């Protein structure tokens, strides 16, 4: 039979274990909150990069209007912002005629922005696929894992 003294001893022995488990639970809960916050911030960065990419592509499309008539060629130029098609002398002459003194600044900014979007996408683990579209890898992975 358990006496009062032995029961108190068991309770006192279990109390530190219980407190330790509660501390572990609280630590785990804090890590979950940090992960949730990280995912929210990461999603905001992915959205920001996607937005800048859309602005970038819209600017390319706008500047090519009236300069290039072939829709397929426009698509190829937009899909490869630093591709060989951009080096075509005839295209550059038409772009210079359209943009005037802004041509060199525009081309410099286009190259710098493209490089920056690629670098940021790589650092954040975003995938750049055909058409220079930025995809949020985590969203694709979580959708696959939910099945």
Q: Locations of the language-model features?
A:
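Solvent-exposed flexible segments
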Residues: 134-144
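N-terminal amphipathic alpha-helical segments
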Residues: 1-136
């Amino acid at each position: 039979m358990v006496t009062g003294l032995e029961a108190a001893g068991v309770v006192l022995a279990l109390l530190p274990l219980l407190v330790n488990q509660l501390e572990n639970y609280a630590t785990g809960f804090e890590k979950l909150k940090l992960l949730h916050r990280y995912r929210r911030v990461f999603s905001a960065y992915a959205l920001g990069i996607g937005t800048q990419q859309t602005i970038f592509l819209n600017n390319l499309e706008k500047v090519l209007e009236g300069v290039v008539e072939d829709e397929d060629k426009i698509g190829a130029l937009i899909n490869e912002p630093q591709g060989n098609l951009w080096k075509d002398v005839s295209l550059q002459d038409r772009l210079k005629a359209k943009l005037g003194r802004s041509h060199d600044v525009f081309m410099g900014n286009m190259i710098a922005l493209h490089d920056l979007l690629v670098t940021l996408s790589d650092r954040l683990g975003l995938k750049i696929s055909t058409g220079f579209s930025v995809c949020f890898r985590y969203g694709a992975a979580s959708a696959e894992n939910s099945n």
